């Protein structure tokens, strides 16, 4: 089935999703399974970057993931600690894998790393004990450190460092919402959170504990310019606060959290300077 035929079948099935269940067979099930296989192999992805830097979302692939929850029944998933099992609808990406399959895939998966089927992991990625949800895309030579989460359909670029305990938000619903996107060569500091479709552009550095959502103000302290929903290329970002506004009683109100761009660097500086030096002010 061609990509256009897959898209058409999945769109039609999603419009009539109340009639899709574990007993559904034939074209709809085949189309959804084919779409998930394309995602799993990295041959299709939920979001793609155009030459002008704009990202477009393939909504039909998100629909395929959502339909899979209706199509697949709950089942026992073995491999838990102490020979325990899990109970879910989505199997592990590594189900049935042996040495040859791992060598062919070319990435490291440390014990405790969980990747759900339909997530793509590229060559030379290192997965510490972490969680990668379905539909996500993790590109080459990226590190996903311990206790970090890459949410459903999130797009992670090449040579990204996702530090310990980071949360990269996922998105399946609402359909019109875009996924979180971390472009190439970014550094995401420990315990940071990037959610609600925020885009972190190429080479940006987030210090430890930066929290970014769709409405978070990202203020350039040199120019005063404010960004929302996107971190500019090669920006170095730390947690900050905006001053409170006067309340009705005349007192200054509470401050509000924001993120602050403390500097911007070029590609050459970014590649030759340690993260600690970039964050030192």
Curated annotation (Swiss-Prot):
It is found in: Cytoplasm. GO terms for cellular component: cytoplasm. Its EC number is 2.3.1.117. Pathway: Amino-acid biosynthesis; L-lysine biosynthesis via DAP pathway; LL-2,6-diaminopimelate from (S)-tetrahydrodipicolinate (succinylase route): step 1/3. InterPro entries: DapD_Trfase_Hexpep_rpt_fam, Hexapep, THP_succinylTrfase_dom1, THP_succinylTrfase_N_sf, Trimer_LpxA-like_sf. Substrate binds at residues 108, 145. It holds the Pfam family Hexapep_2. Signal peptide: none annotated. Keywords: Acyltransferase, Amino-acid biosynthesis, Cytoplasm, Diaminopimelate biosynthesis, Lysine biosynthesis, Repeat, Transferase. Its main location: cytoplasm. It catalyses: (S)-2,3,4,5-tetrahydrodipicolinate + succinyl-CoA + H2O = (S)-2-succinylamino-6-oxoheptanedioate + CoA. GO terms for biological process: diaminopimelate biosynthetic process; lysine biosynthetic process via diaminopimelate. It comes from the Bacteria. GO terms for molecular function: 2,3,4,5-tetrahydropyridine-2,6-dicarboxylate N-succinyltransferase activity; nucleotidyltransferase activity. NCBIfam families: dapD, PRK11830.1. Homotrimer. Belongs to the transferase hexapeptide repeat family. This is 2,3,4,5-tetrahydropyridine-2,6-dicarboxylate N-succinyltransferase. It comes from Bradyrhizobium sp. (strain ORS 278).
């Amino acid at each position: 089935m061609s990509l256009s035929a897959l898209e058409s079948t999945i769109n039609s099935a999603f419009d009539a999703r109340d009639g899709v269940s574990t007993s559904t067979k034939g074209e709809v099930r085949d189309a959804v399974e084919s779409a998930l296989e394309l995602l799993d192999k990295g041959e299709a992805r939920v979001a793609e970057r155009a030459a002008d830097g704009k990202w477009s979302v393939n909504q039909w692939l998100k629909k395929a993931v959502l339909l899979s929850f209706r199509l697949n029944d709950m089942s026992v998933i073995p491999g838990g600690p102490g020979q325990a099992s899990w109970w879910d609808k989505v199997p592990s990406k590594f189900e049935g894998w042996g040495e040859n399959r791992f060598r062919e895939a070319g990435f490291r998966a440390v014990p405790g790393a969980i990747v759900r089927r339909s997530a793509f992991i590229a060559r030379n990625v290192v997965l510490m004990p972490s969680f990668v949800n379905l539909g996500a895309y993790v590109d080459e030579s990226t590190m996903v450190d311990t206790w970090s989460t890459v949410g459903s359909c999130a797009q992670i670029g090449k040579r990204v460092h996702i530090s310990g305990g980071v949360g990269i938000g996922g998105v399946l619903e609402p359909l019109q919402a875009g996924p979180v996107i971390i472009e190439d060569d970014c550094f995401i500091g420990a315990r940071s959170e990037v959610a609600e479709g925020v885009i972190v552009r190429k080479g940006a550095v987030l210090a430890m504990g930066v929290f970014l959502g769709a409405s978070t103000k990202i203020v350039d302290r040199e120019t005063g310019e404010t960004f929302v929903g996107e971190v500019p290329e090669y920006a170095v970002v730390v947690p900050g606060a905006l001053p409170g506004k006067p309340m009705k009683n005349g007192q200054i109100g509470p401050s509000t959290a924001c993120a602050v761009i403390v500097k911007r660097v070029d590609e050459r500086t970014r590649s030759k300077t340690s993260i600690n030096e970039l964050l030192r002010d």
